Amino acid sequence: MGQTIATPLSLTLDHWSEVRARAHNQGVEVRKKKWVTLCEAEWVMMNVGWPREGTFSLDNISQVEKKIFAPGPYGHPDQVPYITTWRSLATDPPSWVRPFLPPPKPPTPLPQPLSPQPSAPLTSSLYPVLPKTDPPKPPVLPPDPSSPLIDLLTEEPPPYPGGHGPLPSGPRTPTASPIASRLRERRENPAEESQALPLREGPNNRPQYWPFSASDLYNWKSHNPPFSQDPVALTNLIESILVTHQPTWDDCQQLLQALLTGEERQRVLLEARKQVPGEDGRPTQLPNVIDETFPLTRPNWDFATPAGREHLRLYRQLLLAGLRGAARRPTNLAQVKQVV
């Protein structure tokens, strides 16, 4: 009897309940059939090195993410929950994933200092021996702090990312995803996606707040159709932002302000408040529960605490439900009569 060879894909299917729970904790849902189809077919056909049996390599996951988060019609917003869950399993692996993690890359060796040349034996000469001096080297970074150049060895961005320098060519388009790998991708391909991550892990594993920049909001608005024209496309965009960026309550209001009209925002908020669950899990009509779960004024939720993050997770889920509810417009009977 031959033994069955375990693969990353087969492992996830054997532990499917844990995979679904991991996705649910991130505010998304995944389905087993689509999970298999993406891994065995669609991601393989992207020609970025994704193996048919799946992988927990962050390099492969990052390559697939670049395709999924591509701007405009080239992206795949419906695949965001799946690749996000793959990344979560790779970066915070449960015990059954650890044996299948690729070995860590060896650190790049530091260049060895040049060994000093042996001094020549003393010989008599008619001329004095002068020491050889090298010409002074220019500094790697300009001394002017206002210079647009940055130190490419710096791994962490400044606390409030400001405007970026002019790009070599082509329009700037938005990007998404986790810090270290995304920083490297952005340096290699600066016109790909936005780097804003309102909530990210800081020192001592504490969440650190990074707001959206004006350029992020501008790019999302200018590269996507308005809600009135294509509500599904804009809803998919906002869903990918909610999943990957995990914005705070203030960030959500800023996002709605930038991407929706005043009437559209009112409709979205109204639909979202209709979906607030009660104690039995069904939509409630109790005003105090609705105001506490989906407030219209800024709540006192601390994203650095588990309770605050849970409030924000539910708020983002309800906001997405409100977008989908607002996208379902009632039939205009007057227009139907005109067509008939």
Swiss-Prot record:
A motif (PPXY motif) lies at residues 157-160. Residues 100-119, 136-146 have a biased composition (Pro residues). SUPFAM superfamilies: Retroviral matrix proteins (SSF47836), Retrovirus capsid protein, N-terminal core domain (SSF47943). Gene3D superfamilies: Gamma-retroviral matrix domain, Human Immunodeficiency Virus Type 1 Capsid Protein. InterPro entries: G_retro_matrix, G_retro_matrix_sf, Gag_p12, Gag_P30, Retrov_capsid_N, Retroviral_Gag-Pol_poly, Retrovr_matrix. The record marks 127-128, 197-198 as: Cleavage. This is Gag polyprotein. A motif (PTAP/PSAP motif) lies at residues 118-121. A lipid is attached at residue 2 (N-myristoyl glycine). Residues 120-132 have a biased composition (Low complexity). The lineage of its organism: Viruses, Riboviria, Pararnavirae, Artverviricota, Revtraviricetes. One of its GO terms (biological process) is viral budding via host ESCRT complex. GO terms for cellular component: host cell plasma membrane; membrane; viral capsid. Keywords: Capsid protein, Host cell membrane, Host membrane, Host-virus interaction, Lipoprotein, Membrane, Myristate, RNA-binding, Viral budding, Viral budding via the host ESCRT complexes, Viral matrix protein, Viral release from host cell, Virion. The gene is gag. This protein is synthesized as a Gag-Kit-Pol polyprotein. A motif (LYPX(n)L motif) lies at residues 126-130. It holds the Pfam family Gag_p12. GO terms for molecular function: RNA binding; structural constituent of virion. Residues 97-208 are annotated as: Disordered.
